[in-house]
Amino acid sequence: MCSTCANVLKYYNWDPHFKLVINPNKFLSIGFCDNPLMCCYPELLPEFGTVWDCDQSPLQIYLESILGDDEWSSTYEAIDPVVPPMHWNEAGKIFQPHPGVLMHHIIGEVAKAWDPNLPLFRLEADDGSITAPEQGTVVGGVIAEPSSQMSTAADMASGKSVDSEWEAFFSFHTSVNWSTSETQGKILFKQSLGPLLNPYLEHLSKLYVAWSGSVEVRFSISGSGVFGGKLAAIVVPPGVDPIQSTSMLQYPHVLFDARQVEPVIFTIPDLRSTLYHLMSDTDTTSLVIMVYNDLINPYANDSNSSGCIVTVETKPGSDFKFHLLKPPGSMLTHGSVPSDLIPKTSSLWIGNRFWSDITDFVIRPFVFQANRHFDFNQETAGWSTPRFRPITVTISEKNGAKLGVGVATDFIVPGIPDGWPDTTIGEKLVPAGDYAITNGSGNDITTANQYDAADIIRNNTNFKGMYICGSLQRAWGDKKISNTAFITTATVEGNDLIPSNVIDQTKIAIFQDNHVQDEVQTSDDTLALLGYTGIGEEAIGANRERVVRISTLPETGARGGNHPIFYKNSIKLGYVIRSIDVFNSQILHTSRQLSLNHYLLPPDSFAVYRIIDSNGSWFDVGIDFDGFSFVGVSDVGKLEFPLTASYMGIQLAKIRLASNIRSTMTKL
């Protein structure tokens, strides 16, 4: 007999040395019946395991167990049962429980018999699927404790939420950089009490109108070579705006050290005058983490800063409750969480100025854009919807003219075509002729090598700085094929184009051969934006004076040590087989979401997303109330695409955004 068959026989009492016995009725806590799985609830039996008859041979049971396994059906490889069949003496059967069911039962029996005077134990699986996190050191005393009376009153007034296992463990919320360059009084972390602090609370908050109770926050510090430094955890009451000053230490606070090995736990108490908060209530108790003593690392030097990573985890306090259930599809008037402004993968990122893929982030002192840029009020200072589709206009010309003014037929701002590009030409032009591209010596550029080797590119084209459009031009009686169109925002004076960075219905300039004769011909033009004639120019959107606006140009600068960014993509150039960079103020998906949805974001805060490249480098991008994006580093470096984005929560704008990218240091 083979060894496998011998081992199988041992499962079923053919080996006299041992016998495995089980009673699956104990899996059910039923008090009125002593045999529920065979009497009252036989339909539940398959949920707990498989029943075999005792008259079947051991080998037959073994083979049937293998043949019923999913692994056999897909690979035809025999996998021994994880849990052996056992004797169910009360039913005269052999029962093989599901592994998870048996494990749950065993853990429950261990827990019942555990002596509360013994130390706690930690349970883990090899693959990390089962964990019981270490709790850390609880810090209290000066911080208010949860009020059980208020919690009970809130339950009586509105109903109690369902208890679940997610209430028992800490979940990741965010991480914060603490570097040796941060001085005393610098705020590293500020978060108001509310469901947004915890991913499970945020998820469940969609089902309720109100909440109440405290949240526990756990901080873990990790750093290399750290010698000293302290942080202060400060509880700031509702109605007080934290400031970056040591005067904040006049509020209740506790200190913890950078060399702290164990995690530190704080409770953010719910200081309220009502039974509960509506989801729109952001004026709640805040927890602020401030630098108390500067971080010291003796291994750091002038060209190399050092720091720690402070990991922030949260879980609901014992008194946290949700109140006033609402249907899942109902929308609250105050707005929703801005958790879907950036798609999870960069393969879905295109610009809001041009429709090609985003390839980089460009940090600038100032970022500005009006067209297709939306804020958290669902408003834009531009004239286009957050989508790309062909521009539709009509144009009337006579006497063989090729330059004219288009009349919008599809628009959201009267007279300005939806999708019209938002930069003007750099100088006065008389559109005519062909491309004229030369190098610094005045020699014509006709090859890629000549273009790449040229130290200076001179663009003498008479329609430079205009956008190239594929055209469907139609007019009654005109049977000729359509010609390429060149468009821009400018004042048309005879055959001249005068630059204008303010757009209105008189500045829709189109240069195109529409086969016009002496009589007036009105053409219906459908224009698809394809390229640009600004060979040798700086990136599109980089020059404030050439960016078009109706009246106001939305603009932003640095905030709290965070730098504004453009999202960079490119557009193809005319004549030369090359491209030019385009600066976009938003990802188009962000523009679309802000235009369609009302999101909840305080004016002094960021909606934070973590961007991770394929090599594991990451940095946080914060989107402010005006719709502009920021990063906390001065240079994001070379990123390995594709990138992924994940929502991290709401952060105060005055706090530097986190990253694991080391900024370039310069020594004078």
Swiss-Prot record:
Effect of residue 124 to Q/D: Partial loss of precursor cleavage by calcivirin
One of the Pfam families matching this protein, by short name: Calici_coat
Cellular component, GO, one term: host cell cytoplasm
Annotated positions for site Interaction with host receptor F11R/JAM-1: 459, 462
Domain of life: Viruses
InterPro entries for the chain: Calicivirus_coat (IPR004005), Rhv-like (IPR033703), Viral_coat (IPR029053)
Site description Cleavage, residues in chain: 124-125
Phenotype for residue 125 to G/H/L/R/V: No effect on precursor cleavage by calcivirin
Keywords per UniProt: Capsid protein, Disulfide bond, Host cytoplasm, T=3 icosahedral capsid protein, Virion
CDD domains, sorted: rhv_like
The family this protein is said to belong to: Belongs to the caliciviridae capsid protein family.
Comment field (misc): Mostly expressed from a sgRNA. Expression from the g-RNA is low and occurs at a downstream start codon generating a smaller, truncated LC-VP1 (tLC-VP1) protein.
This protein's name: Capsid protein VP1
